[in-house]
Amino acid sequence: FFNFIIEQGCCPDGRQARQHNPFQERADLVKLKNPLLAVRDMERSKTFYREVLGLHVVMDFGANVTLTGGLCLQTLDTWTDFLGKEVEEIRFGANDSEVYFEEDDFDGFLAHLVGCADVVYVRPPLEHRWGQRVVRLYDPDRHIIEVGENMKSVCRRFRDQGMTPEQIAARMEVPLKFVTGCLR
């Protein structure tokens, strides 16, 4: 949600985001490319991401796999080698980060999860105070995966419930400009 606000260049209260960063003056900025998760069992992880989230292998180098959307999986033994660490120094299930996905058909996704045998929920699905519905679950290595309702879908759901754009903006705690953009 907040990434979308940042991409739109405005703060939650409607002001334009203003930050000076000397790196912005460079043409060769660093760019986030691929989040990477260390995994104990590559095949089990590929199966989970395919069956639960619908991601497919784009590139498979054996010890490193890139899935649709850019998520990378790395075998634990090669990851520890890259870091110069021991396996015991890698902590799975620390509950201190997540990988975030969005879904247009959130109700359909929840129905899909019911048919997935190995899904372990961090907590049941919930609706945040701004109206976005989310579900958090663990992957086989207990990395937290969040799937949230697409913000355009949230705006449209509220509109379909009879709310005006102004009411939606107030309910979601976002600028009216954000709401009107989502409703186009």
What name fits each language-model region?
Residues 1-9:
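Extreme N-terminal basic, low-complexity initiation segments
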Residues 10-44, 97-99, 150-184:
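N-terminal beta-strand motif that seeds the catalytic metal site of vicinal oxygen chelate
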Residues 40-42, 94-141, 161, 174-177, ...:
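Vicinal oxygen chelate
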Residues 14, 56-93, 144-149:
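Conserved short beta-strand elements that form part of the metal-binding/catalytic scaffold
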Residues 136-153:
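A contiguous, mid-protein "functional segment" used to position or interact
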Residues 41-55:
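Amphipathic alpha-helical segments
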Residues 51-58, 118-119, 174:
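Conserved acetyl-CoA-binding loop of GNAT-fold acetyltransferases
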